[in-house]
Amino acid sequence: MHPAELSPATQDYLKTIWRLGEWEPERVTTTSLAARMGLAASTVSEALKKLTAQGLVTRPAYGVVELTAEGRDVAVHMVRRHRILEMFLATELGYAWDEIHDEAEVLEHAVTDRFIDRVDAKLGHPSEDPHGDAIPSRDGVITPAPAVPLGDVTHPEPVRVTRVSDESPETLRVLAEAEIRPGAVLRVLPGPDRSATVRVRVAGGGTTPGGDVPGGSSPAALATQGPPDVAGTAASGGVTVELGILVAEAVWVQAFTHAS
């Protein structure tokens, strides 16, 4: 089934179900789906009945929602459109990274596959969007870099930011102010137990709003490189910032691994 055969609302439901399961370990539920979409649970339940009848989702347990193979194909197709459009808006039209999500939400339902393929080629077939999320290939393959939430990091070694959630424009503005973007090097600093904030030292090296990384490397490629001199920039340079827990939860990082 091609997304063009479905309504924009159906496309949004399938994409949102997929995105909820992309980074969160918990199963997608009617409640979590309603919260993410800003709709009443009763409205979502009615929509899910229709999606189930269309063979796009299943309900394996009470309140639990899963995509069928056909539903996943549609969802990933829409995710690809969305993320390529975000890159286009940022790199070609100069949109800030806190503006591109809402614009792409509108455009993704109006453009054709041919247009998306042309834009993808124009951009050089990027592997990530400006927020660091992996862009699915034309045949639906997606390979996100392994990452953990910044708030889960307890060791003092430097880590590289691999992606930032685009759900909150305000959070993106806070992180941009702190120069925390995909590719940035961070070190979590000690703080009191049960603190409502996370203190980090930002050593720089992040991408621009358009996703460009100094030196021409993508955030995914940078994750395979070694950290900067630990006795220098990553250890003692940079700026120390204090992030609220909700802001820190929007940042996903990866430990450095040295290329063999």
Language-model features: where?
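Extreme N-terminal segment that seeds HTH/winged-HTH DNA-binding domains in transcriptional regulators
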Residues: M1-L39
